[in-house]
UniProtKB/Swiss-Prot annotation:
The keyword Isomerase does not apply. This is Large ribosomal subunit protein uL18. GO terms for biological process: translation. Residues 1-27 are annotated as: Disordered. This is one of the proteins that bind and probably mediate the attachment of the 5S RNA into the large ribosomal subunit, where it forms part of the central protuberance. CDD domains: Ribosomal_L18_L5e. GO terms for cellular component: cytosolic large ribosomal subunit. InterPro entries: Ribosomal_uL18_bac-type (IPR004389), Ribosomal_uL18_bac/euk (IPR005484). Part of the 50S ribosomal subunit; part of the 5S rRNA/L5/L18/L25 subcomplex. Contacts the 5S and 23S rRNAs. GO terms for molecular function: 5S rRNA binding; structural constituent of ribosome. Residues 9-21 have a biased composition (Basic residues). It holds the Pfam family Ribosomal_L18p.
Length: 122
């Protein structure tokens, strides 16, 4: 058994992932943060240390259209679709997916699938 809490395990995985993931201007990083109640996605250029676009379940565009709270797979689909549309509007087509130390399952996976369906390539 591990002596680390689940949050500490997630942070450890995230540190390990970030050693290899780096966003550039041509291929920025799509970073996902998942809390208990909401999900957030940002497209980040690590070289310029600049956030190019972002979306979350707290966005005004999504708050009215979401029926449940922001902790469902449907909400993650909406966030993935919105962040992909905003990235494509800025001319970003390819990204590097950063799952933030979370397992690629559930809400993180549904966000990634929705972003792919909307046109982002990763």
């Amino acid at each position: 058994m591990s002596n680390l809490s689940r949050k500490q395990q997630t942070q450890k995985r995230h540190r390990r992932l970030r050693r290899h993931l780096n966003g550039t201007a041509q291929r920025p990083r799509l970073a996902v943060f998942r809390s208990n109640n909401h999900i957030y996605a940002q497209v980040i250029d690590d070289e310029a240390q600049n956030t190019l676009c972002a979306a979350s379940t707290l966005d005004k565009d999504l708050r009215t259209s979401l029926k449940a709270d922001g902790s469902s797979c449907d909400a993650s689909n909406a966030v993935g679709d919105l962040v992909a549309k905003r990235a494509l509007a800025k001319g970003i087509q390819q990204v590097v997916f950063d799952r933030g130390g979370n397992l690629y399952h559930g809400r993180v996976k549904s966000l990634a699938d929705a972003a792919r369906e909307a046109g982002l390539q990763f």
